[in-house]
């Protein structure tokens, strides 16, 4: 894991059609939360399948379980034949203190047996302020993920510092729309946000 500091299907042979379906899609299965009523019964019957496409809407998963977060990140580099995205790298942008590096390596090692690949191809960058985050998203995001790392999957953790009481409402109201506009410009990657709260202008799940 690299840490950074600051036409119609029937007209085509079936195997080509299947490959095309896999090419730009990433399927995630969202389980009910642990605190749902009658949880055991719900877990057996109620699951949400989400199909994400490169250049599509930006999904925000609210209060996701750590296992879901880590599995999603690792599956970004897993081959398509094993329900992964087969991205050259996965870029993870951390804006909070709740990111579990150990769980990612555990998932890569024990579940998928690709620990070495995960350590090499999962790129992690941490930012500490809303201004650092805004600068990276607005100025550097596209060139970093498209040109340098060629990431088909980009993960952003946290709520863009919107819950930080030390940041003025004026700064939040000014910077947040610009950051969302910047990430929506990215057309060659799937961008997912894992946030403790729902976020405006994104497709929220959970």
Each language-model region and where it sits:
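The Walker A/P-loop phosphate-binding site
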Residues: 1-110, 114
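Helix C-cap/helix->beta junction micro-motif
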Residues: 84, 148-150, 186-189
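Hydrophobic helix-cap positions at the C-terminus of alpha-helices
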Residues: 76-80, 140, 144, 186
């Amino acid at each position: 894991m690299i840490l950074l500091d600051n036409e119609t299907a029937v007209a085509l042979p079936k195997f080509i059609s299947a490959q095309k379906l896999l090419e730009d899609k990433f399927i995630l299965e969202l389980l009910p939360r642990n605190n749902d009523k009658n949880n055991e019964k719900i877990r057996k019957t109620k699951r949400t399948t989400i199909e994400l496409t490169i250049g599509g809407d930006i999904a925000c998963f609210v209060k996701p379980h750590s296992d879901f977060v880590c599995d999603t990140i690792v599956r970004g580099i897993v081959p398509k034949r094993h329900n992964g995205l087969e991205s050259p790298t996965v870029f993870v942008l951390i804006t909070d203190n709740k990111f579990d590096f150990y769980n990612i390596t555990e998932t890569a090692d024990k579940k998928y047996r690709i620990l070495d690949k995960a350590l090499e191809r999962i790129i992690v960058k941490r930012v500490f302020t809303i201004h650092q985050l805004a600068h990276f998203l607005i100025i550097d995001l596209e060139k970093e993920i498209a040109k340098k790392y060629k990431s088909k999957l980009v993960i952003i953790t946290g709520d863009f510092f919107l819950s930080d009481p030390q940041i003025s409402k004026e700064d939040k109201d000014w910077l947040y729309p610009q950051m969302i506009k910047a990430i929506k410009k990215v057309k060659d990657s799937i961008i997912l946000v894992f946030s403790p709260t729902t976020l405006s202008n994104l497709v929220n799940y959970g």
